[in-house]
């Protein structure tokens, strides 16, 4: 093969009349490669003529006009050794002859031209031929991807609420739909509201605040719709909290929980009035106050013993007010004397009679009369001053009422009250004897 290449080069040097661009096109288009392949394949293929010979002859004649015979001979010699190659090599040879400049020497062209001609001429056509294949493969991939694309339907279900949509999993939404049908609700939002009402105690236990927002003006529409078809009392989860607060106050003041009936219910004038921009908030608050009033009524019906006790106490208080003498009696003014010792709260927690261990007990025990014990504390100007001096006015009012009731209720009420005050059994026995003496003195005073 090397020998054939050298022979071709020497033949080209001996023919100076051959134009360099034509020779360069023949050599750069694959003439050397074709000669090497022909030397390896044998000489039997050179005898058979082919149509490529005429094609290469026509291309080389169009390239050179004044050297047509020499160019045709060179092209024929190259085609006889390379007729088995693809025709695009010769098309590249024609393009290279028109565009490539003539090199300075023939040996330099052998080193540079094949490397430039192969990517420039043949490479471009190979890429062009491979382009449709790549595009078809891309279309096939896109078609396969389109077949495997996930559906555009949202897996979450949209539920109405507070002017926006709530996104929830499909399983949760299915359960909400089923519950809506079973409860007979009109919308899924109503069902979710019902679920929140049922779970309010657990929500309060978990968060400490609950789900009732502080800004009612932002929930006018929701409250209005909820008030029309509420299936359960809205304030019911908070009833136990209100009762707990009342019980704590009662325990702090020293009397039982049934005395919360003495506390007045909220007056009607404190009910909030609906505003034009928030018509649902006022209705909601009025409903809560009505439910609170119903709660007190239910408690009084469920506890008949406590109710009877409260009625008895009210009757005793009315009888005490009727039997009380005018407040201008100078003999009754001594009752506020123990206030000078600094025991204001202890004085009103205890009945009006004196004890042997108290200050001035000897003189006070002989002069106290039973009717004076029923006198209301508000009748004494000095007692009012004591009340104003104290910070807890409402607590003192309740304590004063309890003191008067315990004084008129006999030994049982006095014993019950002094058990809360932490007295010893000996003091309680002495109190019973004093109660008996006070009752006899009261009977004598009433007979006189």
Curated annotation (Swiss-Prot):
Taxonomic superkingdom: Eukaryota
**Looking at the keywords, is Transcription regulation present?**
yes
* GO CC, alphabetical: nucleus
Q: Where is the composition biased (Pro residues)?
A: 263-277
Q: Which InterPro entries match?
A: TF_TCP_subgr (IPR017887), Transcription_factor_TCP (IPR005333)
Q: What gene name is listed for this protein?
A: PCF3
Matching PROSITE patterns: TCP (PS51369)
Q: What is this protein called?
A: Transcription factor PCF3
Name where it's found.
Nucleus
Role summary: Transcription activator. Binds the promoter core sequence 5'-GGNCC-3'.
Record keywords: Metal-binding included? no
Keyword vocabulary terms for this entry = Activator, Developmental protein, DNA-binding, Nucleus, Transcription, Transcription regulation
Compositional bias ranges of the Basic and acidic residues kind: 295-304, 413-432
Q: Where is this region: Disordered?
A: 34-68, 142-161, 258-282, 295-336, 387-448
Classification of source organism? Eukaryota, Viridiplantae, Streptophyta, Embryophyta, Tracheophyta
Gene Ontology MF term list? DNA-binding transcription factor activity; sequence-specific DNA binding
Q: How does it assemble?
A: Forms homodimers and heterodimers.
* One of the Pfam families matching this protein, by short name: TCP
Q: Which residues form the TCP domain?
A: 152-206
Q: Where is the composition biased (Low complexity)?
A: 34-62, 391-406
């Amino acid at each position: 093969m090397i020998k054939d290449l050298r022979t071709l080069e020497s033949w080209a040097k001996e023919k100076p009349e051959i134009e360099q661009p034509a020779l360069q096109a023949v050599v750069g288009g694959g003439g050397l490669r074709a000669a090497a392949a022909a030397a390896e394949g044998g000489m039997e293929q050179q005898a058979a003529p082919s149509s490529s010979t005429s094609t290469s002859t026509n291309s080389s004649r169009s390239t050179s006009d004044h050297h047509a015979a020499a160019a045709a001979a060179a092209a024929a010699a190259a085609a006889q050794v390379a007729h088995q190659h693809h025709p695009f090599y010769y098309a590249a040879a024609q393009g290279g002859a028109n565009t490539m400049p003539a090199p300075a020497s023939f040996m330099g062209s052998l080193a540079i031209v094949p490397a430039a001609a192969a990517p420039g001429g043949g490479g471009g056509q190979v890429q062009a031929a491979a382009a449709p294949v790549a595009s078809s493969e891309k279309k096939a991939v896109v078609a396969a991807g389109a077949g495997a694309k996930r559906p555009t339907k949202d897996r979450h279900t949209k539920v109405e609420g507070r002017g926006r949509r709530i996104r929830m999993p499909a399983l949760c939404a299915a359960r909400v739909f089923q519950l809506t049908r079973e409860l007979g609700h009109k919308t899924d939002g109503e069902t979710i509201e019902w679920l929140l009402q049922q779970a309010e105690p657990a929500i309060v236990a978990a968060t400490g605040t609950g789900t009732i927002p502080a800004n009612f003006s932002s929930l006018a529409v929701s409250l209005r719709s909820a008030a029309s078809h509420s299936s359960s009392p809205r304030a019911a989860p908070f009833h136990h909290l209100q009762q707990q607060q009342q019980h704590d106050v009662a325990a702090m003041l020293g009397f039982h929980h049934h005395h919360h009936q003495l506390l007045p219910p909220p007056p009607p004038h404190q009910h909030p009035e609906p505003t034009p921009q928030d018509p649902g908030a006022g209705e909601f608050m009025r409903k809560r106050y009505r439910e609170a009033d119903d709660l007190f009524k239910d408690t009084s019906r469920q506890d008949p013993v406590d109710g009877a006790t409260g009625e008895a106490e009210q009757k005793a208080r009315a009888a005490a007010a009727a039997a009380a003498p005018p407040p201008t009696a100078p003999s009754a003014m001594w009752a506020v004397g123990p206030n000078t010792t600094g025991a204001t709260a202890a004085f009103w927690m205890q009945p009006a009679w004196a004890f042997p261990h108290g200050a001035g007990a000897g003189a006070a025990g002989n002069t106290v009369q039973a009717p004076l014990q029923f006198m209301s504390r508000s009748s004494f100007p000095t007692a009012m001053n004591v009340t104003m001096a104290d910070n807890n006015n409402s607590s003192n009012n309740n304590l004063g009422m309890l003191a008067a009731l315990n004084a008129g209720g006999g030994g049982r009420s006095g014993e019950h009250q002094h058990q809360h005050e932490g007295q010893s059994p000996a003091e309680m026995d002495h109190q019973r004897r004093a109660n008996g003496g006070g009752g006899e003195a009261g009977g004598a005073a009433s007979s006189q």
